[in-house]
Amino acid sequence: MILSQFDQNIQPLSSAILPRHIAIIMDGNGRWARGRGKLRIVGHQAGFQAARRAVRFAVHCRFNALTLYAFSSENWTRSNTEISSLMQLFIYALNSEINNLNKNNIKLRIIGDVNRFTQELQDCIYRSEQLTSNNNGLNLNIAANYGGRWDIVQGVKKIIAQIQKGVLKPNQINENILCKYVCMNELSPVDLVIRTGGEHRISNFLLWQIAYAELFFTDVLWPDFNDIVFRRALHSFMKRDRRFGKSAFI
């Protein structure tokens, strides 16, 4: 369960200065497994448990949205065995968690090009999204077969289609229009990006949505990510002076 095992001793942070939308690049599953002499899939399974903890904490803090980078469009270069194991884990995660997500008023959405997935996984995604579609609590977005460049391109293609239909004119196209056609367009932009695993890069994640996001990098491998590390990221965010491109002296 996501909430039933929550540590009641953890006190809520000040909601006035917390981020509304957090995105996490969940990195380090493979290294976590290798360091323990385990198969990579064991690391991914442990990463699934870390994701459950992150969702639980996000609900507790009453964030508006949490977006998790589960599978990038570049991850298809991994071995067939690992990809197959990941897809089965994805199906298991959806089937085992969806009722609990629904009970906790969480709205689940999968962002990315799901057409490349097996029909079984696509059906599972559809059922999960439909079941939680009317919920108005945490917006939980799972980025799967997702890439930031793909997101922008698919948005541009939709705009071109609207122009061809006569709905839009070329001279109407601006940032506000494009914003309506990228993933998660109805949610607030990402405020905070957390990346685990010690790498300091974005890896083609939400390139449009994180334009003014604060970045937090930690050496903690994803399976070891917990509420303490999450709070550390939040405290770092709360100390930032977010200027959104403006001068510090204005």
Swiss-Prot record:
The keyword Manganese does not apply. It catalyses: 8 isopentenyl diphosphate + (2E,6E)-farnesyl diphosphate = di-trans,octa-cis-undecaprenyl diphosphate + 8 diphosphate. Binds 2 magnesium ions per subunit. Its EC number is 2.5.1.31. Substrate binds at residues 28-32, 40, 44, 72-74, 76, 78, 195, 201-203. It is an enzyme of class 2 (transferase). The active site is at D27, N75. Its cofactor is Mg(2+). CDD domains: Cis_IPPS. One of its GO terms (cellular component) is cytosol. GO terms for molecular function: ditrans,polycis-undecaprenyl-diphosphate synthase [(2E,6E)-farnesyl-diphosphate specific] activity; magnesium ion binding. Keywords: Cell shape, Cell wall biogenesis/degradation, Magnesium, Metal-binding, Peptidoglycan synthesis, Transferase. One of its GO terms (biological process) is peptidoglycan biosynthetic process. InterPro entries: UPP_synth-like (IPR001441), UPP_synth-like_CS (IPR018520), UPP_synth-like_sf (IPR036424). Mg(2+) binds at D27, H200, E214. It comes from the Bacteria. The keyword Magnesium applies. Homodimer. Catalyzes the sequential condensation of isopentenyl diphosphate (IPP) with (2E,6E)-farnesyl diphosphate (E,E-FPP) to yield (2Z,6Z,10Z,14Z,18Z,22Z,26Z,30Z,34E,38E)-undecaprenyl diphosphate (di-trans,octa-cis-UPP). UPP is the precursor of glycosyl carrier lipid in the biosynthesis of bacterial cell wall polysaccharide components such as peptidoglycan and lipopolysaccharide. Belongs to the UPP synthase family. PANTHER family: DEHYDRODOLICHYL DIPHOSPHATE SYNTHASE 2 (PTHR10291:SF0), DEHYDRODOLICHYL DIPHOSPHATE SYNTHASE FAMILY MEMBER (PTHR10291). This is Ditrans,polycis-undecaprenyl-diphosphate synthase ((2E,6E)-farnesyl-diphosphate specific).
